């Protein structure tokens, strides 16, 4: 069950005494955030707005929406990171899943006893990582937890940042991800080029995602070579507050033009196939907003992420593209 740190929210409201607040969180916990907004309204007697647009992480907080509503505080729930206060009026609130891992850890011990593994997870299960590491160690599995960097805690990964995994990849036999997210685990597999497994407490299984990740990379590579045939490109800047990478976009524009390509600069809040269908005479796109937009969605035309775009430039220069996803981060 998902447990939201409601105490922190009510403590902040009691201390700061805002006239109104806004709350948001990932889609999976939005009903709980909805209930919490109602609870704040009833208990504190202030408007509590539920920002129901998707929020994918600290790069996508929708603080603009909170500002439009004149909400004095925004509580972003479920995107744990090192920064408790993201900006002066944005509070990052923990939302943890308390499901036990005991049974699936037993299966993990049988499979990995005598091996060295990197233990990783996302926000929901970060509070369990030390306990699970100790249990594995006590049963003959050598466990390493990589150091966090920037917003990342030790052992924590985002969908686009993998520092705790990449820094120890040469010291381990495999990666073990706590949770259910193929999204995060496949990213770990690609960033480290190591066998990667999910410890899923809900299905009580140890599930390998290495082949799934390889298929992702094959599709991504195919899109790179398709894009190489395009004469006209659209380079897309994301308009969400943490995705505004104008300098990267301008760099790609110049380098594509140096290769003889025509480039349109485009700005979008939500980069979807439907929006891109409205644009004419563009053979391929590069988007510098979020790498997972490219790897996890289907588009009619190539829509390359930053790592793919860097590889595209190598293709255009007749160079080897290499393991382009094997990076600390994909931004």
Predicted features along the sequence, with ranges:
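N-terminal basic/disordered segments at the start of proteins
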Residues: 1-16, 20-30
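Glycine-rich phosphate/diphosphate-binding loops that line cofactor/substrate pockets in enzymes
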Residues: 8-19, 108-117, 224-233
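Structural motif
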Residues: 23-28, 53, 78-79, 95, ...
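Short, charged N-terminal beta->alpha structural module
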Residues: 24-47, 120-147, 238-265
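Redox- and metal-dependent alpha/beta enzyme cores, enriched for Fe-S-associated oxidoreductases
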Residues: 132, 183-263, 270-279
């Amino acid at each position: 069950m998902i447990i939201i740190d409601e105490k922190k929210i009510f403590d902040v409201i009691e201390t700061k005494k805002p006239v109104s607040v806004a709350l948001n969180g990932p889609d999976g916990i939005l009903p709980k955030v909805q209930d919490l907004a109602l609870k704040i309204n009833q208990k504190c007697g202030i408007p509590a707005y539920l920002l129901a647009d998707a929020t994918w992480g600290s790069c996508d907080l929708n603080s603009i929406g909170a500002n439009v509503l004149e909400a004095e505080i925004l509580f972003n729930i479920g995107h744990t990171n090192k920064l408790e206060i993201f900006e002066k009026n944005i509070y990052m609130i923990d939302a943890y899943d308390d499901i036990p891992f005991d049974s699936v850890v037993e299966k993990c011990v049988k499979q990995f006893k005598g091996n060295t593994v990197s233990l990783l997870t996302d926000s929901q299960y970060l509070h369990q990582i030390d306990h699970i590491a100790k249990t594995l160690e006590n049963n003959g599995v050598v466990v390493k937890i990589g150091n966090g960097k920037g917003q990342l805690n030790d052992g924590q990964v985002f969908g686009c940042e993998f520092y705790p995994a990449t820094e120890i990849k040469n010291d381990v036999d495999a990666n073990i991800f706590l949770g259910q997210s193929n999204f995060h685990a496949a990213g770990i597999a690609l960033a480290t080029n190591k066998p990667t497994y999910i410890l899923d407490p809900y299905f009580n299984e140890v599930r390998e995602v290495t082949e799934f990740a390889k298929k992702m990379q094959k599709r991504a590579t195919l899109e790179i070579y398709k894009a190489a045939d395009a004469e006209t490109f659209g380079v897309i800047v994301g308009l969400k507050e943490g995705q505004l990478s104008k300098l990267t976009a301008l760099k790609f524009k110049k380098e594509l033009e140096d290769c003889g390509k025509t480039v349109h600069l485009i700005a979008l809040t939500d980069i979807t196939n439907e929006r891109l269908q409205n644009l004419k005479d563009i053979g391929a796109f590069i988007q510098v907003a979020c790498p997972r937009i490219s790897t996890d969605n289907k588009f009619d035309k190539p829509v390359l992420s930053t790592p793919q775009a860097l590889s595209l430039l190598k293709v255009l220069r007749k160079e080897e593209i290499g393991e382009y996803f094997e990076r600390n981060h994909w931004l």
